[in-house]
Amino acid sequence: MWIGIISLFPEMFKAITDFGVTGRAVKQDLLQIQCWNPRDFTFDKHKTVDDRPYGGGPGMLMMVQPLRDAIHAAKQAAKAEDGVEAKVIYLSPQGRKLDQQGVKTLASNQKLILICGRYEGVDERLIQTEVDEEWSIGDYVLTGGELPAMTLIDAVARFVPGVLGKQASADEDSFATGLLDCPHYTRPEMLDGIPVPEVLMSGHHENIRKWRLEQSLERTWLRRPELLDSLALTDEQRVLLAKIKKQHKIS
């Protein structure tokens, strides 16, 4: 997968390219990341990248010309190798909220260009003419789009073939099935007087599967019950959920 990044602070993306699972994916050429800094497309000695908004008000906007030129350079680079164009994403609090289904959808693209805003944002006309989709990571405001872009990259990279040691790691994550993940345990068997659940020590794979499913359902019902509203539960899941609700009603 190829990802182009438009950012005034490309150095921040070393957190993605140099460390962990994504860093290994970059080294193995499973994930290719290139950055374009709008400052490199300025013509004045101060490398100005901000401008005043029409109508006044606090703050500045990203200057149109350097940002647009950086976007065009990234688009050309994306298309140069095989003619495939990249989908252009603007990270914005006004965008569609990123969830696991959205991550899967974005991961189906061969190429993405991520625009990281700064200041008070970018000219609306650039969004209309250069951007395909706007995405948000939540209902809050950050100082820039770099951290949302890194969040998106990290989430999307997990669905690139070969990035994870086992694809099941992605398939069994929280939200992968629409449910929260079940609890997990490792050694020691006893920690501060709390044992590992016996079923996980039994070696009985079917019982372990059912226990994990029940735990996932219980956690989802207790912590994020709204997630269940959009799920088409299986017969097994409905029976387990009824059991869970009955147990909590009794207790």
Swiss-Prot record:
The keyword Transferase applies. It is an enzyme of class 2 (transferase). One of its GO terms (biological process) is tRNA N1-guanine methylation. It catalyses: guanosine(37) in tRNA + S-adenosyl-L-methionine = N(1)-methylguanosine(37) in tRNA + S-adenosyl-L-homocysteine + H(+). It comes from the Bacteria. Its EC number is 2.1.1.228. Its main location: cytoplasm. SUPFAM superfamilies: alpha/beta knot. InterPro entries: Alpha/beta_knot_MTases, tRNA_m1G_MeTrfase_C_sf, tRNA_m1G_MeTrfase_TrmD, tRNA_m1G_MTases_N, tRNA_MeTrfase_TRMD/TRM10. It is found in: Cytoplasm. GO terms for molecular function: tRNA (guanine(37)-N1)-methyltransferase activity. S-adenosyl-L-methionine binds at residues 117, 137-142. Pfam families: tRNA_m1G_MT. Keywords: Cytoplasm, Methyltransferase, S-adenosyl-L-methionine, Transferase, tRNA processing. GO terms for cellular component: cytosol. HAMAP family: TrmD. Specifically methylates guanosine-37 in various tRNAs. Belongs to the RNA methyltransferase TrmD family. Homodimer. This is tRNA (guanine-N(1)-)-methyltransferase. It comes from Actinobacillus pleuropneumoniae serotype 5b (strain L20). The gene is trmD.
